[in-house]
């Protein structure tokens, strides 16, 4: 009966997320519609039950990223994290950089033998942030790949093992740096 369907909806709402309840009720409503087609004399008990469920999307909390000058640590990981912070580039783009990609005033994001780009429009140049200049001077002295250890042969991907250390050390994922850069650019327009 309709009362049973309403009671079931209430029971689900006590135990599950409202959006999950809506999905389950929509599935049951579809099944009940088929039943009503096969037996025209039956009543559709699930029709309209979803209309009274309000789904409130939780707002993501704002992430505060500490300034790189306060980061603790050294080595390849921290160098890559600084590049991510100041460029907004993708992790694979930075992890697969070559010394030849570091010019005096900009960083070239371009495909190389081991690292294709995500899309054809990903090829670009990024101005060098003043706080990256000293690091770039040292890195420019290298030959070939800047961080060859970041390449994973089995998956043919760059920087795949950096997400967890980044989250653990800095409280943000590599993608979070890219999102932050986009937000900063939008707010400065």
Where are these regions (language model features)?
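Conserved tyrosine-mediated DNA breakage-rejoining catalytic core shared by Y-recombinases
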Residues: 51, 87, 96-135
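Basic, Lys/Arg- and aromatic-enriched nucleic-acid-binding interface segment
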Residues: 18-27, 37, 41-95, 178
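Short alpha-helical segment immediately N-terminal to, or the first helix within
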Residues: 12, 83-84, 184-188
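Exposed loop/turn and edge beta-strand positions of beta-sandwich/beta-sheet ligand-binding modules
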Residues: 77, 122, 168, 176
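Short, polar N-cap/turn motifs at the start of nucleic acid-interacting alpha helices
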Residues: 101-105, 171, 188-189
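Active-site/catalytic core of tyrosine-dependent DNA strand-transfer enzymes
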Residues: 129-172, 180-181
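Short, basic/aromatic-rich helical patch in the C-terminal catalytic core of site-specific tyrosine
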Residues: 5, 28, 32, 94, ...
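N-terminal core-binding DNA-recognition domain of tyrosine site-specific recombinases/integrases
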Residues: 1-33, 152-157, 171-176
